[in-house]
Amino acid sequence: MSSLTNPNIFTVSRLNSEVRLLLENQLGIVWLVGEISNFSAPVSGHWYFTLKDSMAQVKCAMFRGNNRLVSFKPTNGNQVLVKARLSLYEPRGDYQLIIESMQPEGDGRLQQQFDALKMKLASEGLFAQSSKQAIPEHPKCVGIITSKTGAALYDILDVLKRRDPSLPVVIYPTLVQGEEAAIQIAQAIGRANSRNECDVLIVGRGGGSLEDLWCFNNEIVARTIAASQIPIISAVGHEIDVTIADFVADLRAPTPSAAAELVSRDNSHKDQALMSREQKLRAAWRHYLTEQNRTIVSLSHRLEKQHPRYRLMRQTQQADELQIRLQRAMEKYLAQREQKVSRVQHKLQLLSPVRQISEQKNALARVEQKMMDAMDRKLLRLRHQIAIAAEKLDTVSPLATLKRGYSITQSESGDVITRQSQIKTGDTLVTRLSDGEIRSTVN
């Protein structure tokens, strides 16, 4: 059966197309923190790079229409926070991210610190439910640890005044933002425990950015909350704001006003029922809005994918890929030609007459040196043989006999006198000794 008529059999191109649509339509927008590597900016103006961390990496493309809005020029090694869509480069089947915006890592770094501290404290059991203290059902005195000029304090006081005007309140003022805020918050909690005049504490502030709320993600504050003998309700920011203090506290309230409601008596059960219904309605409405927004985003993405501009981007990316491959092929070809030329040059050097003459000169010099060495050894042997022969001649030499005390007598003409009959009266005789001669006359 043909693959074109069987709906259960895919071609490769169809499979890649289906996977791309699945990635783009189902997952939508993602935020990602990572380090840039393999950064490339072809003449088309698009950017191609890899985002990585210590464990994994993913290929990314940022088209010219988006990257021209980036306020800095990325380089390898940059830590960045990106907003991206998941996609698939169909010709190669490569999963990739299409980057829509990029900025240097800031909040991403704080989030990593947040996650690291959260994991550390959780491993020590500071978040365990078994270590939580029960919040008094009807507190006799409420302590408030927050800024004395912040809106959070007035929100708490307004709720307490409306719900339980007779409830005593003690305020422990402190900074709730800045470098010194964490130390002051911890000191205020310690001061409340030392004075021991309240049976529940509310620690919090109004909403703000991640940096504004960062003092409530401080390890000192977290450990001070965990060590408090008085139950603590955290009430930091809005409902969507979550801090380390929320995990360590005995109870988390979504807002300072909600914390005030938790510690105050409600004089009207009807108000409670109404509030419960209101909360359910708000939750249902938020859920409905979220689903509708998700549907709108999905439909807008589908419409965007059908736009000719998107097809042009994919074709441009493919052209960039072909350009890169062509450049690599040319570089490889040139490198091979250079190697071949180098080998030919080496062979020519080996066959060069100048080189051969130089080698023959060196060989002749070595032979000449060997001949000189052989002549020196031959002369040495001859000198040794002559010395031995001289010793032998010296042994039989007349002079050697004279040295042993003998003498030789000769006539004046030089004949050796060996018999008495060779001389007569009046002859002059020469007697040779080892150190000279004696002349005498025969009487």
Curated annotation (Swiss-Prot):
Cellular component terms (Gene Ontology): cytoplasm; exodeoxyribonuclease VII complex
Catalytic activity: Exonucleolytic cleavage in either 5'- to 3'- or 3'- to 5'-direction to yield nucleoside 5'-phosphates
PANTHER family: EXODEOXYRIBONUCLEASE 7 LARGE SUBUNIT (PTHR30008:SF0)
Function: Bidirectionally degrades single-stranded DNA into large acid-insoluble oligonucleotides, which are then degraded further into small acid-soluble oligonucleotides.
Biological process, per Gene Ontology: DNA catabolic process
Broad EC category: hydrolase
One Pfam family matching this protein: tRNA_anti_2
GO terms for MF: exodeoxyribonuclease VII activity; nucleic acid binding
Record's protein name: Exodeoxyribonuclease 7 large subunit
Keyword Iron-sulfur belongs to the record: no
EC number: 3.1.11.6
Organism of this sequence: Vibrio vulnificus (strain CMCP6)
Subunit relationships: Heterooligomer composed of large and small subunits.
Family listed: Belongs to the XseA family.
Record bears the keyword Hydrolase: yes
Keywords assigned by UniProt, alphabetized: Cytoplasm, Exonuclease, Hydrolase, Nuclease
Subcellular location: Cytoplasm
Annotated CDD domains: ExoVII_LU_OBF (cd04489)
